Amino acid sequence: MISDESDNFNPRDPRPADAGKPSKNEKRRAARQLATQALYQRQIAGASLNEIEAQFRVDNDFTFADLPYFHDILHGVHAHLTEIDAALAPCLDLTIDELDPVELCVMRLSAWELLYRVDVPYRVVINEGIELAKVYGSTDGHKFVNGVLDKLAPRLREAEVKAYKR
């Protein structure tokens, strides 16, 4: 007898049919993590963006990550690097060249989301940036990233920030 998933259906099982599958938010978080690593690799090694993306597709399991979002981040940050760095500069006490490379990658990714992904709420962008800095940055790097993003968000998303603070 041929078995398929419908054979396992149990109407008393409270779990949704897609239980165990990552949510959209979880897939985006994984895409941000992989993109942070890829942006760092690009910054340090200087390999081409297409080579890095191809390597990441081979070396990583994208089952739990949003591959199109990973692609958008990687290419979006690269394409808009001048605008991103210009947006970050007034919020920094250091020059771009003086920043920790990992924290710079995280802040560039977050700035890209604030500038070009208005579908992602600014509070989510800040929180995700902080979490990335906690995982990949220096011991207190997340505090620095938080401070910069807290200054950057109102500059780039003034109406959204004001609406939230009411």
UniProtKB/Swiss-Prot annotation:
It comes from Pseudomonas fluorescens (strain SBW25). Residues 1-30 are annotated as: Disordered. Involved in transcription antitermination. Required for transcription of ribosomal RNA (rRNA) genes. Binds specifically to the boxA antiterminator sequence of the ribosomal RNA (rrn) operons. It comes from the Bacteria. Keywords: RNA-binding, Transcription, Transcription antitermination, Transcription regulation. GO terms for cellular component: cytosol. NCBIfam families: nusB. Belongs to the NusB family. One of its GO terms (molecular function) is RNA binding. Residues 10-25 have a biased composition (Basic and acidic residues). SUPFAM superfamilies: NusB-like (SSF48013). It holds the Pfam family NusB. GO terms for biological process: DNA-templated transcription termination; transcription antitermination. This is Transcription antitermination protein NusB. The gene is nusB. InterPro entries: NusB-like_sf, NusB_fam, NusB_RsmB_TIM44.
